[in-house]
């Protein structure tokens, strides 16, 4: 499974690890992804999503249906 948030589409970022002597080596900054079971009131069931922690906070504010519609995600297929 790829490390991508299912609602926001966030994925890894390419960055530099910079040492004290300022030598640069490339590193990958991964997204903090968590498996989350969310109650979907319209479908009357639980939906299991792989979300970034930022998406979990936004989900609490917006609600699942509005956030999924904005992301273009069909919850019936999950």
From Swiss-Prot:
Top-level taxon in the UniProt lineage: Bacteria
A Pfam family per the record: Ribosomal_L28
Cellular component GO terms, alphabetical: ribonucleoprotein complex; ribosome
UniProt keywords, alphabetically: Ribonucleoprotein, Ribosomal protein
Statement: the UniProt record of this protein carries the keyword ATP-binding: no
GO molecular function: structural constituent of ribosome
InterPro entries: Ribosomal_bL28, Ribosomal_bL28/bL31-like_sf, Ribosomal_bL28_bact-type, Ribosomal_bL28_sf
Any GO BP annotation: translation
Stated family: Belongs to the bacterial ribosomal protein bL28 family.
PANTHER family referenced in this protein's UniProt entry, alphabetically: 39S RIBOSOMAL PROTEIN L28, MITOCHONDRIAL (PTHR13528), LARGE RIBOSOMAL SUBUNIT PROTEIN BL28M (PTHR13528:SF2)
Protein name, as recorded: Large ribosomal subunit protein bL28
Lineage: Bacteria, Bacillati, Cyanobacteriota, Cyanophyceae, Acaryochloridales
């Amino acid at each position: 499974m790829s490390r991508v948030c299912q609602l926001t589409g966030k994925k890894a970022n390419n960055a530099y690890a910079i040492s004290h002597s300022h030598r640069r080596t490339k590193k990958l900054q991964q997204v903090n992804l968590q498996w989350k079971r969310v109650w979907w009131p319209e479908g009357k069931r639980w939906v299991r999503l792989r979300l970034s922690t930022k998406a979990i906070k936004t989900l609490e504010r917006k609600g699942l249906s509005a956030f999924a519609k904005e992301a273009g995600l069909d919850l019936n297929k999950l």
